Amino acid sequence: MAEICCVKEIQEEDVEKIRLPTRPELDIPDSDHEDPTVNEEEGCKTPTSSDHKIPEVKYTLCPPAPRKPKPNRSSGTKRKLTPVNVVNRIPIDLSREIEMFFEDLDRRIKKSRKQ
C-alpha cells in the first residue's frame, strides 16, 4: 500500500509536468480573419459575365395551362357496336307475354290460398 501513496503524491505534485502541451505550431485561422483572395484561387467559380447569363425572355402573357383531354362518349361502352349489329336488331313488343305471365301467377296464388 505504500507504493500507492507514492503514486498519489507524484500525481498531485507534478500535474503541470504531466499535462500534454497544446500544439501552437498548428496555425488555424479564425473565420473572421479569412483572406478573400485565397478563397477565389482555391475553389470553383461561377461565371458572372453577360455571355454566361440566361437571356431574359419578355412575355406579356403566359401560355394557358395544359388541359386534360375530354373522354369520347363512345369509349364508355365496353363493346363497340358495329353497323352489322345495329342493322340486325329487331324491336319486339313483349308486353302481352309479360302480362299473361303475371296473370297466371296471380291465379295460382289465389288457388293455393283457398285450399
Curated annotation (Swiss-Prot):
Q: Where is the composition biased (Basic residues)?
A: 67-81
What is one term from the GO cellular component aspect held by the record?
nucleus
Keywords (alphabetical) are: Cell cycle, Nucleus, Protein kinase inhibitor
Provide the GO biological process annotations: regulation of DNA endoreduplication
Tissue-wise expression: Expressed at low levels in roots and stems.
What are the GO MF terms of this UniProt record?
protein kinase inhibitor activity
Task: List locations, semicolon-separated.
Answer: Nucleus
Primary place of residence? nucleus
Complex and partners: Interacts with CDKA-1 and D-type cyclins.
Instruction: Please report the name of this protein according to its UniProt entry.
Output: Cyclin-dependent protein kinase inhibitor SMR3
